[in-house]
């Protein structure tokens, strides 16, 4: 559902931010 999709997108963004921070 939308919640699952939103969670996936947020997860990807979080990973991108974490990688960028490193």
From Swiss-Prot:
Compartment list:
Secreted
- Using the chain's own numbering, where are the disulfide bonds? none
Organism, as annotated: Xenopus boumbaensis
Membrane-crossing residues?
none
> What GO CC annotations are associated with the protein?
extracellular region
Name its GO BP terms in alphabetical order: defense response
What job does this protein perform? Answer: Antimicrobial peptide.
For the modification Leucine amide, which residues carry it?
A: 22
Give the main location.
Answer: secreted
- Name the domain of life: Eukaryota
Q: Which UniProt keywords apply?
A: Amidation, Amphibian defense peptide, Antimicrobial, Secreted
Q: Would the keyword Metal-binding be found if you checked this record's keyword annotation?
A: no
How would you summarize where this protein is expressed among tissues? Answer: Expressed by the skin glands.
Q: What is the name listed in the Swiss-Prot or TrEMBL entry for this protein?
A: Peptide PGLa-BM3
- Tell me which family the UniProt entry assigns to this protein: Belongs to the gastrin/cholecystokinin family. Magainin subfamily.
């Amino acid at each position: 559902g939308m919640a699952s999709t939103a969670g996936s997108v947020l997860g990807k963004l979080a990973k991108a931010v974490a990688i960028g921070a490193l």
